[in-house]
Amino acid sequence: MATPSTGANNSIPAVRNQVEVQVGLVGDAQVGKTSLMVKYVQNIYDKEYTQTLGVNFLKRKVSIRSTDIIFSIMDLGGQREFINMLPIATVGSSVIIFLFDLTRPETLSSIKEWYRQAYGLNDSAIPILVGTKYDLLIDLDPEYQEQISRTSMKYAQVMNAPLIFCSTAKSINIQKIFKIALAKIFNLTLTIPEINEIGDPLLIYKHLGGQQHRHHNKSQDRKSHNIRKPSSSPSSKAPSPGVNT
């Protein structure tokens, strides 16, 4: 007696889970937040982006085994008049990416204030520190390259944040930023090689001087580099980004 066929038409399709993950992009104006978002989601680069007015967002789906991950990426305009919209990009975000322009050291100094205000709104988000425009950095004086690299390493250590130098113009480390974000959120093992040589596009995510999610001696580390823990009330009045404290 023939055995009934169990062809493909009779198979039950695998059930896929879907998870939406919010990622906030914050930093000074014209550091490359929109450029990073559009490059990652649409693989498009345009050096003539206009400044973001308020908050922009795009979505991208990635798949891990039987799960579809929807990245909902929030891009906050860096002008001071949009600081009241900071909660849109930070509250509910699993990851907050702090961006600075590698060719403008003042934008790295501003990270102190961005971090203070963002952390006051969402102290459970995973921080990632990203230096943009690496393709322009390599044309600058080697002494400056070393200075900005070492200073950004100190910031990343205090924040206990992965540090990544990227270039949207040259497609350097763009995908890796979000792979690292995904791995940090879901505690996945990463095999991406780290890059920690001065002059190269830094990519450091393992040896951060503490446990994941900044759950180490936070108050002591912030004090040593002037990155302070915010007051317990997120609504308390704080200096605008760009004001060094």
Swiss-Prot record:
Region feature (Disordered): 210-245
GO molecular function, one term: GTPase activity
GO cellular component: spindle pole body
Residues the record lists as binding GTP: 27-34, 75-79, 132-135
InterPro entries: P-loop_NTPase, Small_GTP-bd, Small_GTPase, Small_GTPase_Tem1/Spg1
Pfam families: Ras
Regions that span the bilayer: none
Ranges of Low complexity composition bias in the record: 229-245
Spans annotated as Small GTPase-like: 16-244
Coiled coil: none
Known function: GTP-binding protein involved in termination of M phase. May play a role in triggering the degradation of G2 cyclin to inactivate M-phase promoting factor at the termination of mitosis. Acts upstream of CDC15 kinase and may be required to activate the CDC15 protein kinase pathway.
Record text on subunit structure and interactions: Interacts with CDC15 and AMN1. AMN1 and CDC15 compete for association with TEM1.
Name of this chain's protein: Protein TEM1
